[in-house]
Amino acid sequence: MEALKRKIAEDGIVLSDQVLKVDSFLNHQIDPVLMQQIGREFARRFEKDEITKIVTIESSGIAPAVMAGLELGVPVIFARKRKSLTLTDDLLTASVYSFTKKTESQIAISGNHLSKDDRVLIIDDFLANGQAAEGLLSIVKQAGAAVCGIGIVIEKSFQPGRDELVKKGCRVESLARIQSLEDGKVTFVQEVRS
């Protein structure tokens, strides 16, 4: 997605050869126009998949997921990382390690919101090692629902997340694929269009 790549190139800050900071438009301050474009692009890529629910993880996945949900006309469910007084019954849970925060979290979704009849699109802001996506996959499978695909805003293709998900049979659609963050520079994967 060219608009996203431009935004990353202009406003993204390379903190190391492993970490890209995009808090000015994605995961702290949110650019709503860009989020709307992201939602439309996910909807376009998954429009034939008869999606019934979108699942994401709090908090940075919520904005792109809601915009995609708006475009597809389906509800969005986000997995909580923190315990909630109201989220107690029929929980679907998974353990997720955060590469950025270097912490492990127990994520949870109420089983009341997912069923075996659902066709789910998983959306997240970043794909690095694939831990968040794998946790969400586990939760969706616990519900008996079908995963139609995984939509990623920014993929760090130099890390193993995509390969791990593809090995599990997942369709992964990333809007911006980063080949490298070496020398303080963002280099995108050159994708061949058919």
Swiss-Prot record:
User: One Pfam family from the UniProt entry?
Assistant: Pribosyltran
**InterPro entries in alphabetical order:** PRibTrfase_dom (IPR000836), PRTase-like (IPR029057), Pur/Pyrimidine_PRTase (IPR050118), Xanthine_PRibTrfase (IPR010079)
Pathway(s) served: Purine metabolism; XMP biosynthesis via salvage pathway; XMP from xanthine: step 1/1
Q: Which GO terms describe its biological process?
A: purine ribonucleoside salvage; xanthine metabolic process; XMP salvage
Kindly state the subunit structure of this protein: Homodimer.
**EC number of this enzyme:** 2.4.2.22
Q: Which family is this sequence assigned to?
A: Belongs to the purine/pyrimidine phosphoribosyltransferase family. Xpt subfamily.
Q: Which GO terms describe its cellular component?
A: cytoplasm
Keyword annotations from UniProtKB, A to Z: Cytoplasm, Glycosyltransferase, Purine salvage, Transferase
Q: Which residues form a coiled coil?
A: none
Residues that, per the record, bind 5-phospho-alpha-D-ribose 1-diphosphate: A128, N129, G130, Q131, A132
Catalytic activity annotation: XMP + diphosphate = xanthine + 5-phospho-alpha-D-ribose 1-diphosphate
Give the species this sequence originates from: Bacillus velezensis (strain DSM 23117 / BGSC 10A6 / LMG 26770 / FZB42)
Please name the gene that encodes this protein: xpt
Q: What does this protein do?
A: Converts the preformed base xanthine, a product of nucleic acid breakdown, to xanthosine 5'-monophosphate (XMP), so it can be reused for RNA or DNA synthesis.
> What are this entry's molecular-function GO terms?
xanthine phosphoribosyltransferase activity
- Residue positions binding xanthine: L20, N27, K156
Q: Please state what the protein is called.
A: Xanthine phosphoribosyltransferase
